[in-house]
Amino acid sequence: MSWTSLVGTALSTMLARRTRLMGDAAHWRRHTAGLQRRQLRLLLQQAAQTEFGRSHDFARLTRLNDADLLAGYRSAVACGEYDGFRPFINRMRDGGEIDVLWPGRIRHFAQTSGTTAGDKYIPVSREMLRSNYRCALDIFANAQRFGCSLHRLLTGKVLFLGGSTAMEVNKHGIATGDLSGIVTPLIRWPISEIYLPGKRIALMSDWPAKIEAMARACVHADVRMINGMPSWMLVLFERVLELARAGGRPAKTIADIWPNLELIVHGGVKYAPFDSRVRTFWSGRSDGPDVARRLELYPASEGFIAIQDQPGSPGLRLCSDAMNFYEFIPLERVNDAAPPAFAADEVEPGQRYVVCMSTCAGLWRYIIGDVVEFDAVPDRLGRPDTGSGPARLRIVGRHRHFINAFGENLIVEHIENAVAAAAGATGLLLGEFTAGPVYPQEATDLAPSRRAGLEVVLEHTGDISPDRLARFNAVFDSELKRQNVDYTTKRTAGLGMAPPTVTVLPLGSFHRWMQQRGKLGGQHKCPRCANHRDFVDGVKAAAGVG
């Protein structure tokens, strides 16, 4: 028995009470509203003497009762995006100024992937690191609830597919880089003994070289848990299998190499489109057995947002007691001058909202851009038994990532669900994908006329027969119609939009395109759709397809 299993046993004991609490749905239904008001009050109290806190009278707000606190806060602080915080952040990061948005000096800034805009620098305070640590413990607490033995899990290795841990440090001692670079150095003994790929490989910023080094470091290891985006797990799985076979091992699947792999923790992108390929790598069949357990997260550079608390459920429970306060802006109102925002107990199931956060690192009513829907909502403040469960939400897109060139009103979730359904119906093993509009054009001497439409570009492991591709296209189109009445209308009776176009590229095309953009790595996501053709044309050009 490995001595690190004792760490798992100790962690299991330490988390026993929290594990029970994670499973108490009635507790989270009853108390989420109060917990969230408490987080807001604590945030305002801590930041009351900062420049931002003084100018927005946080000290006065902290003296209000729970019923008036939120209304007062909303009156004092407007919802805003990064540009509104940029001057403050520049002073804190470049000038080393203290007590600006949050008490003291912020010594770490997470550089975001910039999926909807240019790079942003998100403050990461000591309190935020503690918040993230607490949420990380909740991952293990929920894993126990899902049937994982921490004793058994921590007997082997835990593999993290994160970004580079290399940081740029300025003259004020302030470090900027991937969030991985801020968190990984905090891994201490004894967890450091089971952590893969190790700090030397974690420092690497050349992602193809990093995947190669990671595969070589873990091909002979007893990997029992993997944390990362599924798209990069697949790249690693493929290389690990190649190395194992080259070394003479009769490995047909990842299960042959890592038979004790028990838990995949994933987040950042929707898992369903990658499910069949993960199963194929694990068991040899796209409809075969899966890794024993999967657990989905909703992490962000701004703070941890939600964790899956029910096996197999798409709804993720809001981290309502982690020193962050969440509000939700109706998607159709997000561009208003003063958009309305609702606390977790004020939302309605099935409506789309843009996430707005107030964090323990000094972002106040900050619009992060993700679009979510709630499957369950908690009791309203002071109104028992009015909710349907803990605050559980699903990520359905980005408020700047949509397709509405012809009134079709498609969002990321529609595209992801349609790709997953079509892949499942045809048995295709897909990689990355994206979609964009096809603009109509009149016939010319050089080209025929073209109707308005939609193009989806996707990766596949090999050749696809015309019949199979036509079947994929038909299911993809049908699934979009099922989800979206506007798309159905535009596709009915020749009212404007032609059937979708599917362009198939070889595996690796998207990562080559991302590398050309300087966006390759475990912290960067391929955009799933856009209301322009930049992504579609860019990845096709990178693959040499006109």
List the predicted regions and their residue ranges.
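Short small-residue beta-strand/loop micro-motif enriched in glycine and branched aliphatics
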Residues: 118-122, 402-405
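Amphipathic alpha-helical segments in well-structured domains
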Residues: 129, 133-137, 176, 412, ...
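Active-site diphosphate/adenylate-binding microenvironment
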Residues: 34, 38-42, 46-109, 121-127, ...
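Conserved AMP-binding loop of ANL adenylate-forming enzymes
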Residues: 143-190, 201-204
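Conserved helicase ATPase motor motifs in RecA-like P-loop NTPase domains
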Residues: 110-116
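Amphipathic alpha-helical surface "interface" segments used
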Residues: 62-75, 156-163, 497-503
